[in-house]
Each structure stands twice: as structure tokens, then as C-alpha cells.
Amino acid sequence: MKLTLPDYDQASVLVVGDIMLDRYWYGPTGRISPEAPVPVVKVEQIEERPGGAANVAMNIAALGGHVHLVGLTGIDEPAKALNEKLTSLDVRCDFVSLPDYPTITKLRVMSRGQQMIRLDFEEGFHGVDKGLILPRLEQSLTHVKTVILSDYAKGALEHVSAMIKLARDAGKPVFIDPKGTDFERYRGATLLTPNLSEFELVAGKVTSDDELVEKGFELIERFDFEALLVTRSEHGMTLLQKGQAPLHLPTLAQEVYDVTGAGDTVISVLASSVAAGKSLADACKLANAAAGVVVAKLGTSTLSTIELTEAIYGSQDSGYGVIAETELKQAVSVARQRGETVVMTNGCFDILHAGHVAYLAEAAKLGDRLIVAVNSDSSVQGLKGPGRPVNPEDRRMAVLAGLGAVDWVVPFTEETPQRLISEILPSLLVKGGDYKPEDIAGGKEVIAAGGEVRVLSFEDGCSTSKIIEAIRGGKG
């Protein structure tokens, strides 16, 4: 079964953690300062992005999820900038604003794609009264499906054990991006997402997958977790769940440019996917694909559902193969975002012959992507009568998917594909034979939507019915 995106509009997530503002100063450098042996950067562009728990929330909002963010800030310009940016992205902000603390701010000076220096403006929020955050968390639990605790060891999660208990008592899964070696404070969490270095600081050095799995399950047992997702850079990710076989996911990153904020993206996609109804295993696959996208970007970054869909389906020139209707709609949406022309045709294709191959090759030349809608077995029998189809639908679709001209093959159960075509609305609908455009199923809907209908000729002498008659008659 192919992996598909959930409807993130159904996801509601509470994010609690260390909120930061990431600032970037960009500019060229071409000389050394006369005052000291350091490069001089001429700042030409300034950019501000939410960081830490705020970046987690922003990632969820970018996918279309509903997110409530709770954390600590100062009463200052960075806090105002964060609130304005996040509110504009439909993040519900619930900041505990403290006058005696500065909002955590990290300033990076960038030149020629490289980070020259980072300056941190922070004092942390250690020792803050737990009564400031816990009531806000508790009040929010009835409105969300999952909870993320984003720990950067800055003080917002100083009372994390109490937070976990409140959420778990309310029946909410708790996902934690941990910090430090004290995993005891995370006892009872649903899932932790340590990177390999963080994992080894607690479990000890690992030299093989088997050793990682063994030590990971020991941690799950010791700290009463339900699962661990260990992120392993170029080696991908490993999901360990109680009572389940380990799931090793290879990295999907094509290029690693900047890992800043990648962990935020992983946990945001993971928790929002579960909130939208995905299994933990499928949510981890989506998070793995998302990580492969954001590490190719500079700085803390988000990704769209279009980018995530592209990462899942890949970009193989040979096409995407047999696909369900829901998946097809997502794939077509991606193609349209790319500006590609989508061509669609349909048929029984009971015995694929040279005429079919030539016809499909011609159809493929008319656009960038070719969809072939195939009658199901019951549909073929209703059209052709007893004894048909000769080949069951899974085999017919597999053969079609193997053709280089074909991108997607999708089944339909009705007598005609009119409903399917009216929902896909390709740029170009084609059909082979002696049809008139106005008589082709779905043609009127395609034309009404601004598309085109075209009739292509079949190669003379090629007929599925004649081939079947010849075989049954012992000829050929």
C-alpha cells in the first residue's frame, strides 16, 4: 500500500517548549578588518524566523494543521516579532511574558552560504514558577489530539514530568524532542526523537543496527516509553515500538545544506500526522521524507504539503505506477503546481497489444504526465460479457504501469470513467477509435473546466477481441 498524506486540517497539536527567535544577517565579504584578523561582512539583508518550539509550531501550520503554542518569552521587541510572525501564520500563541527575562534570540551572520558567527542573546528561564505554564497546558488539552514538548534546556520544560502526566492522564499522545542525558524526566512519554549522538549519551556507543535496536528497547522498557525514533543523519531513522519489529528508514535527502531545525520538522510532521489519523509507522515515514526536504534549505525552515508529496512520490522518469484514486488526486495536484500538462485516457486493456502501445505512446507525447484509467474486472464483465476479462485487473494494471509512456494507472469500478474524469479534470482527455469528442465519457466536464478532448487513431489490424478469438480458435 502506497503512503499518502493525511488531511492535516484534521490535525490539532499543542506545542509546549523553548521559544526562540532566529535572526539572519546576510551579506558579501571580501576583505579582512584592519582592526582584527576577522572578515568584514557588509550586511545587505536581514531575516527573522521563529526558532525552537516556535519553529515546530510554524512547521505544523505550514502543513495546514491547527496548532497552539505555549512558552516563555520576555516583554521585548523579539517577543513582539515572534507573536506577529506566528499569528500571521495562524499559530495560536499563548506566551507567558516575563519582564525580567529577555526572549531567547540567536543571531547568525551569513556570507557566501556559510555561517560566519552566531551570537546568542539569552539568560534562560530556569527557576520559573511551574504555575505559569502548567495551567495553560491543562486548559489546552481538551482542544488538541497530540502534544509536542520541545526541549532545548532553556527552562520552559523544567517541570516536564508534570506536563507528561497531565497530557497522558487526558489520553493525549506526548512526543518529545529531548535534550541532555536525563531521560528519567521524560518517563511515560509516548515517543522520544533523540538523534544518534543524544541516544548514545544515554544508551552507550552503538556499532551496529542490532546493537542500536537492543539498547533502544532497553530504554523503552526502563523509562516506560511507547516508542523511540532515533534520527541517524545519513543513515536515516530507526523506529522502535513496544511489541513491534524495528523499522529502519533510509535517508531520502538528496543534498544536505543545513541541518538547523531539521529535528523540529521531524517531530512536527510526526505528531501532526498522528493527529490526522496516521499510524505511528506511517507518520515516521512522512517525517523521514520531510527531513530530506528541509536539510536542503538554509536555516530553520518549513515545508509545504506539495514538497512533502513530491518527496514521497519521488520524481522517477518512468512514472509512479499503479495508484489509488486518493493518491492520484494528490499527485496530479503536485503536477499542476509544477506547471505540467496532465493527459488522461481510459480502457479495459484486457490483452495489451501493439495498437495499445502505439496509442499510449502518442497520448504521452501530448503532455507531461499520462494517466490511464482501467476498468475493474466487474466493469469489464458488464461491458464485454461472460468470459471477460481474460486478465484480472491487477495484472492488466501492472503491465500498463511497466510502459515508459505511462505515469499513473488507476482503476475504476463504474461502467464508464465519467465520475473519475470529472474529479481529476485533466488538461487533455484522449480516446482512441471512432468516437466524437462530445460522446467521450467525461469530455463535457473536461471542456467545461477549460480542458481539451482529442480522439486518436488506433493502429489498423489490432483488436483485443480478434486476438482472443484467434487464441480460442487455436490460430496465431
From Swiss-Prot:
Major enzyme class: transferase
Cytidylyltransferase: region residues: 344-476
Gene Ontology biological process terms from the UniProt entry: ADP-L-glycero-beta-D-manno-heptose biosynthetic process
Positions bound to ATP: 195-198
Gene Ontology molecular function: ATP binding; heptose 7-phosphate kinase activity; heptose-1-phosphate adenylyltransferase activity; phosphotransferase activity, alcohol group as acceptor
Renumbered residue ranges of the record's region Ribokinase: 1-319
Active site per database record: 264
GO cellular component: cytosol
CDD domains assigned: RfaE_like
InterPro entries: Bifunc_HldE (IPR023030), Carboh/pur_kinase_PfkB_CS (IPR002173), Cyt_trans-like (IPR004821), PfkB_dom (IPR011611), RfaE_dom_I (IPR011913), RfaE_dom_II (IPR011914), Ribokinase-like (IPR029056), Rossmann-like_a/b/a_fold (IPR014729)
Pathway membership, UniProt: Nucleotide-sugar biosynthesis; ADP-L-glycero-beta-D-manno-heptose biosynthesis; ADP-L-glycero-beta-D-manno-heptose from D-glycero-beta-D-manno-heptose 7-phosphate: step 1/4; Nucleotide-sugar biosynthesis; ADP-L-glycero-beta-D-manno-heptose biosynthesis; ADP-L-glycero-beta-D-manno-heptose from D-glycero-beta-D-manno-heptose 7-phosphate: step 3/4
Coiled-coil stretches: none
Gene3D superfamilies in the record: 3.40.1190.20, HUPs
One Pfam family, short name: CTP_transf_like
Reactions the enzyme catalyzes: D-glycero-beta-D-manno-heptose 7-phosphate + ATP = D-glycero-beta-D-manno-heptose 1,7-bisphosphate + ADP + H(+); D-glycero-beta-D-manno-heptose 1-phosphate + ATP + H(+) = ADP-D-glycero-beta-D-manno-heptose + diphosphate
EC nos: 2.7.1.167, 2.7.7.70
Annotated keywords: ATP-binding, Carbohydrate metabolism, Kinase, Multifunctional enzyme, Nucleotide-binding, Nucleotidyltransferase, Transferase
Family stated for the protein in its record: In the N-terminal section; belongs to the carbohydrate kinase PfkB family. In the C-terminal section; belongs to the cytidylyltransferase family.
Task performed by this protein: Catalyzes the ADP transfer from ATP to D-glycero-beta-D-manno-heptose 1-phosphate, yielding ADP-D-glycero-beta-D-manno-heptose.
Subunit structure: Homodimer.
Name recorded for this polypeptide: Bifunctional protein HldE
Source taxonomy: Bacteria, Pseudomonadati, Pseudomonadota, Gammaproteobacteria, Vibrionales
Gene from which the chain derives: hldE
